[in-house]
């Protein structure tokens, strides 16, 4: 009896915990297979976002992209090139397999600050095919502190000049405005206040982006490096898109500029709601202790009442 009661109690606790998790992160209700080997409470908002994605490189090894797609992965940024002479050995395989599985994918280039911008653009163009169905390219800008040969920081203005040249080159090659990926340190050192019309993909794995960046706007959020997704062995970076299904679809179709938050074409028509009507035979409701409320179209507020509305915010009454 005690064992049975304990088992029922444990089952109830497990169910309550699951319900609490789904309430906090509704996206998990749609894609419960996604996870994190070391989740952080500071990025809960990213896990709530409806449109989830990943970024991958050779470190993820062989990927079963069909399983990745079935787990609800909507997009993937795939490492392509680095510097002026390195191609990720898994790029071509990932590029083809992700498309076949129906995962929207884009290629990213990792910048080396000791290589000329023109050499890096040339290398990217040589290895990344033009594909009208692909997501815009990504320019990954971080300091190369891990490199013995290229670890020194360069002056801010020199870094900005290189970035400008590479953004231009990537856009000329693909016909799409590139995305800028960066981390907290590089953004603070170089990017603060720059390239505001470009989409930004920002990294923050332990706190909301607003706690780490002065930038008020973001388009993609890399919120964990310890994500778990079916089809991938071990940890993988997980990312969230800022907007809605319609914004994601319009961005993919080239109708919406997410960096500038501007419709390029096909802006949806939003119908203005009609004022409420009172059915025949019924009287309009009264506010407590007051006269009946009356709908007044915009611009038709009586002059005598307008001053009161402007100073008190009161609704117009008969």
Regions found by a protein language model. Give the residues of each.
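N-terminal signal peptide c-region/cleavage motif recognized by signal peptidases
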Residues: 24-26
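Substrate-binding cleft of extracellular glycoside hydrolase catalytic domains
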Residues: 40-63, 78-164, 171-173
């Amino acid at each position: 009896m005690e064992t049975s009661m304990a088992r029922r109690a444990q089952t109830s606790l497990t169910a309550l915990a699951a319900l609490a998790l789904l309430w906090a992160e509704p996206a998990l209700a749609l894609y419960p297979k996604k996870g994190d080997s070391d989740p952080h409470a500071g990025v809960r908002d990213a896990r709530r976002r409806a449109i989830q994605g990943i970024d991958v490189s050779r470190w993820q090894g062989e990927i079963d992209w069909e399983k990745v797609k079935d787990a609800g992965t909507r997009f993937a940024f795939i490492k392509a090139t680095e510097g002026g002479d390195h191609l990720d050995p898994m790029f071509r395989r990932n590029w083809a397999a992700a498309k076949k599985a129906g995962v929207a994918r884009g290629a990213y280039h990792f910048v080396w600050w000791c290589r000329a911008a023109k050499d890096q653009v040339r290398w990217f163009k040589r290895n990344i095919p033009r594909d009208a169905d692909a997501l815009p390219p990504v320019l990954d800008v971080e300091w190369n502190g891990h490199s013995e040969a290229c670890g020194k920081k360069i002056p801010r203005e020199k870094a900005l000049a290189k970035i400008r040249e590479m953004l231009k080159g990537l856009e000329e090659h693909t016909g799409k405005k590139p995305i800028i990926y960066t981390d907290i340190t590089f953004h603070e050192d170089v990017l603060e206040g720059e390239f505001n019309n470009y989409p930004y993909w920002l990294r923050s794995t332990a706190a909301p982006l607003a706690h780490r960046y002065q930038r008020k706007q973001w388009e993609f959020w890399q919120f964990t490096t310890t994500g778990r997704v079916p089809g991938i062995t071990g940890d993988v970076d997980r990312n969230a898109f800022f907007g809605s299904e319609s914004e994601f679809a319009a961005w993919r179709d080239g109708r919406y500029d997410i960096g500038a938050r501007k419709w390029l074409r096909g802006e949806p028509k939003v119908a203005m709601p009609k004022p409420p009507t009172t059915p025949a035979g019924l009287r309009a409701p009264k506010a407590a202790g007051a006269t009946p409320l009356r709908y007044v179209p915009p611009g038709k507020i009586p002059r005598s009442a307008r001053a009161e509305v402007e100073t008190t915010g009161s609704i117009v009454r008969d």
